[in-house]
Amino acid sequence: MKKNLLPTLLSLVTASAVCAGEYHLLKEIPVGGDGGWDYLSVDSVGQRLYVSHGTKVAVIDIAKDMVAGEITNTPGVHGLAPAPDLARGFVSCGREDKCAIVDLKTLQIISKVDTGKNPDAMLYDPARQEVYMFNHTGGSATVIDAKAGKVIATVPLDGKVEFGAVDTKAERVFVNLEDKSELVAIDTKTHTVKKRWPIAPGEEASGLAFDEKNHRLFLGCGGSKTMVMMDSESGKVLASVPIGDGVDANSFDPATQLAFASCGDGTVTIAKEEGDKLTVVQTLKTEKGARTMTIDPATHKIYLASAKFSEPAAGQRRGKMQPGSFKVLVYGQE
């Protein structure tokens, strides 16, 4: 009987260890350089963090918490979608309306593919080995065969396209239309729009995260300053919680059932998913301007990009970025 209880006790201890403690700052990783930033993405297997910065992508070794290299010649970069199974990365180059395909071993660009106007967010569908480039001002999604490196479809979306998420089991890609306050569901087999769902009481959603097991979507809504939880099968809005100002990213940790919304006002709202309920459990103070974020599900750490700014002049929202101050903030429960 004692032997039968041991695995159960060990699993309970492990689960409690994962859930215990509030998030706090663990480390700052200096990156340096000048220019703005946008999305971050993690490759847990390769232990790499990809951070868009200026006209390049900074590559960080998250095992050592140090810069390991960079990917250059990516004008107007918004982010990189890693495809670990192909050892490739797909970079949205907003200023030249292209996707740069990168060899993740050498960090060299293999080729560039034409997209729609101003590709912004991006994602990789590992089940179909396809990449979606979401063209923010182009109002469409460019679908790329990740192996062949060729465009196979363009999906008209009719709106200002923001972040997306993929449900490989349901064969759907979800994406926010910020100006329409809608969530669109795309059929990944036919590359056509299947559903358009209103997100009310949410408004102007940008960030998006997905809980595949429980069929829940988490939308960061800047217009209403809320994080909305939606049923990914029916499109029904189940819950909504208040968040900070200037949200730009969402993440979800399946092990802890925690949803995160990072905001430019220097906060991350952390909420617990329990069935149809969503409850705020922590408001984490970060740094003003740290609006984009990603999570490493293997370690439960979240990463945010930030920099130091001078005092703003009269009538301005913020001051100038101090040269060489760009960094990545690492938060965890350790």
Short names for language-model regions:
Residues 7-17:
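Bacterial N-terminal signal peptides
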Residues 1-4:
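Positively charged n-region of N-terminal signal peptides that target proteins for export
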